[in-house]
Each structure stands twice: as structure tokens, then as C-alpha cells.
Amino acid sequence: MIYKVLYQKDKIVNPRRETTQTLYMEADNIVQARALVEQNTPYNIELIQELTGNSLKYEQEHADFKLTAFGQTNSED
């Protein structure tokens, strides 16, 4: 699934709508999406939204749409 994550660059500065940024990512579920962002960035997550159907198509048609991939390690012992 593809998720849209709205965030602030860090957790220290008070959130302001004008400085909210967006990233798009793939994850199995919303819990995994949040965990990946929290483990790999200092971002203050405001909202995570699953994109499907027309919402996904709309976002993909914009120039800013680019999937962010975090280094994932699959350790199966």
C-alpha cells in the first residue's frame, strides 16, 4: 500500500501548517509506515493517510510525487 505522510522536519520546533512537508512511501500497513519513518528520521509525524483509487491517481499526477524508500533489513534467523 502507498501512504502519504505529513510531517515537520524535527520534533523540537512547534508545528506550523506553513512548514508541513510530505513524503510518499510503501508499507504493508499504517503501523509499519509510522515505524519506518520514526526509525529512520527525526520527523514529527502529523498525519499518515493511505492512498487508494482516485486519491492515489491524483497524487501521482503531481510533479512532487516520489516514493521514499528507507533501508529495510529483513533478518530472519
Swiss-Prot record:
The keyword Transferase applies. Keywords: DNA-directed RNA polymerase, Nucleotidyltransferase, Transcription, Transferase. GO terms for biological process: DNA-templated transcription. It holds the Pfam family RpoY. Coiled coil: none annotated. It catalyses: RNA(n) + a ribonucleoside 5'-triphosphate = RNA(n+1) + diphosphate. GO terms for molecular function: DNA binding; DNA-directed RNA polymerase activity. Its EC number is 2.7.7.6. One of its GO terms (cellular component) is DNA-directed RNA polymerase complex. InterPro entries: RpoY. A non-essential component of RNA polymerase (RNAP). Belongs to the RNA polymerase subunit epsilon family. RNAP is composed of a core of 2 alpha, a beta and a beta' subunit. The core is associated with a delta subunit, and at least one of epsilon or omega. When a sigma factor is associated with the core the holoenzyme is formed, which can initiate transcription. This is DNA-directed RNA polymerase subunit epsilon. The gene is rpoY.
